[in-house]
Every structure is written in C-alpha cells, then in structure tokens.
Amino acid sequence: MAFRLKLCPEKTNIDFFWAAPVTFGFSVFLMAASLVAWLTLGLNFGIDFRGGTTIRTESTQAVDVAAYRAALEGQDLGDISITEVFDPGFRADQHVAMVRIGAQDATQSITPEQIGQVEEALKTVDPSITFPSVESVGPKVSGELIRSAILAVAAACAGIAVYIWLRFEWQFALGSVAALIHDVLVTIGVFALFQIKFDLTTVAALLTVLGYSINDTVVVFDRLRENLVKYKTMPLRDVMNLSVNETLSRTIMTLMTTLIALVSLLVFGGDVIRGFVFAITFGVVIGTYSSVYMAKNIVLYLGVDRGGPKKDSKAGTQFANIDA
C-alpha cells in the first residue's frame, strides 16, 4: 500500500478571498513601502556594483578566512569580502583565496600603497602567501553590471508573461507578472530597509525567487483551468477557492521542505552566502503569499472568459429537408 503524506485534509474549504480587497490593498502597500525604502535609503551595494579591488592569494598552507579578516580589520579599508576558491585542478598544496575590497568613493579604488599594506598584513598571518594577481573594477563597469542585472530581471518577467499568456489567458499573465514584480520589489525593499549587502549573488537569488514563485502560481492556475471546465456554472470566486484548496497540501509541503534547507544554510552557511540565502528564504515566503493574494486576486477582478466557442444552431440540419 502506497503511503502518501498529506498536511491538509482531503476536503478543505478555506475561503482565501473573503477579504480580497484587504489582502490586495496590503500587497499594494508593501510594494509602495518597499519602493519608498529603495528610493530613500538606497541599497547597500557590494563590490560588484560599487567597484573595488580583487586580490588573488595563493599559499601552501590552508586558507584561514577568519585570520585573514582579523588581520585586515585595522587597515580601515571599508567593505572587505574574503572567499576561499576550490578547483579540482589545484595541487594538493595549492590553497587559493580571493580578497575583495570595495571602493571607498565613487571615483577610484584603493591605492597601490593600500594594496601593499593589505599584502603585508596577510603575510603576518601566512609568510608563504603570494599574490598572483590584483584586479580593479571601476564605477563605469559597476554601472554596466547594474544595468545588466535590471535587464536580466526584466527579461525574466517578460519571458514568463509571454509563456503564461500562451498557455492560459492574458488575465493569468497579468496576474502572474504583478505577483513577480511584487516579490522582487518587496525583497529589494527589505534589503534597503535593513541595509543588507546587495551584489550579483543577490540578483541570482532574485531570479531564483522568480522561478519558484511562478512555479507555485502555475500549479494553481493549471488546477483552476481544469476546474473552470469541470464546473462551468460555479461562480469564478468559488472555483478559485476550490483550486487553491485542492493544491494547498502541495503548496505547504513545497514551502516547508524548501525552508528546511534554506534555514539550515542561513544559520550554518556563514557570512559569504548569507545575503544570497536570505534573499531566497524571504522570497519564497513572499512568493507563496503573492501567488494567492496577488496573482489570483487580479484574475478574480479581471474575470475569465468561460463562454468558449458558441455552438452553431444550424449545425447538422443542412440536409434535413432533402428527400431521400
């Protein structure tokens, strides 16, 4: 006998749309508040978007990220990111790290003298350390990365809209895109409010959130489309409630299993990936909310064409009066 785990009873009848104006208004408020936080507080851009210097280190000793960071704390260099690099092609005694130092103003990166101070500070931790390369990213390149990131998110939303439009109807596409914009904007608003570092990994997290959110939305939309055919005389609101209730167990299980992995990474993953994991963790939660209370509310307000093709009353009677 197959064992199926169900978090909800077979028949649930939760009215998700009893306060549709309130939930929709709350979603709009979240978007507006996030936009205000973004425009007034700004984002705490990382080195990728602000510019800076990257120093590659190599040593025969194991990389001690904590010791490297402690040695550089007294240099007054601002934003510093240290990550160990792993590659199957490295020798057994080849240990590589990347030290990224953010630009301290909008016009230039750190000076050669400061780079020398960084190298000397790291040599006090590991005398065998070497510095094969030093690369700097200027504000112009950082600005291009910002534009590319915006284009990537916009292209993802546009592609998803076209897909939903072709598979369902334009009302579904509009609801889906509104939910995606809601998810991205609210997540960015949280980053602005708490001044969490925003870099290229955060953009990757936002794209991941878009994929998760649209997957959750499409599952309910697909069930809604089936039920619209099955229950042709049932009011649209009741059909939508039925569809959300029928997929509720799947939605909760997907969310919980995803959060188990993400919370573990958030707690034990360390500082390097914390911003990335936080963006996904918050995004999947807000995405689950928006898939019901943003996307479905818009479809409910716009309505759905349930008439289908009209039958021809003369069909099949063309030859009724012809004598045999």
UniProtKB/Swiss-Prot annotation:
Subcellular location: Cell inner membrane
Membrane topology of the entry: Multi-pass membrane protein
Entry keyword set: Cell inner membrane, Cell membrane, Membrane, Protein transport, Translocation, Transmembrane, Transmembrane helix, Transport
A GO molecular-function annotation: protein-transporting ATPase activity
Annotated GO biological process: intracellular protein transmembrane transport; protein targeting; protein transport by the Sec complex
SUPFAM superfamilies reported in the protein's UniProt record: Multidrug efflux transporter AcrB transmembrane domain
Subunit structure: Forms a complex with SecD. Part of the essential Sec protein translocation apparatus which comprises SecA, SecYEG and auxiliary proteins SecDF-YajC and YidC.
NCBIfam families per UniProt: 2A0604s01 (TIGR00916), transloc_SecF (TIGR00966)
Family statement: Belongs to the SecD/SecF family. SecF subfamily.
Name of the protein: Protein translocase subunit SecF
Organism listed in the record: Cereibacter sphaeroides (strain ATCC 17023 / DSM 158 / JCM 6121 / CCUG 31486 / LMG 2827 / NBRC 12203 / NCIMB 8253 / ATH 2.4.1.)
